[in-house]
Amino acid sequence: PDLEKGWKVVEASGCDNAKIILDTWHWVRANQPFEKVIDMIPADKIVSVQINDVQARPYAKEVLRDESMHDRVAPGCGYGDTAGFCKMLQQKGVKPNAVGVEVICDEYVEKGVDFAAKYTYDNAVKVLKEAWPEVLA
């Protein structure tokens, strides 16, 4: 699935409270362009954003879920242009109710939960300060 299909489900629901959650990992792995797809969705229909980053090469399609569950990297530390994703949403006027970090990375956890939490937090703040400082206020 991609954002266009997800948006069609939200639209077809006819519910005012049906909204979209965007995630940078899914965005990159679905090969979504920055400039085109987001235009069809009103800014107020994007309720939440999850940021993270991706490895340089995706896992094979048959095991892509394994990448999602073990190798998402901290925002700005991979190859997915997390800052560009955030800038796209900021320029569209998106004001999400929540911006979260969804980093699931065995390498970070092996260094300890304290390391994983601090490293992920520090890199998320760095990306957001650069690309979308309003969400930090």
Q: Locations of the language-model features?
A:
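Histidine-acidic metal/acid-base catalytic patches
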Residues: 3-22, 27-137
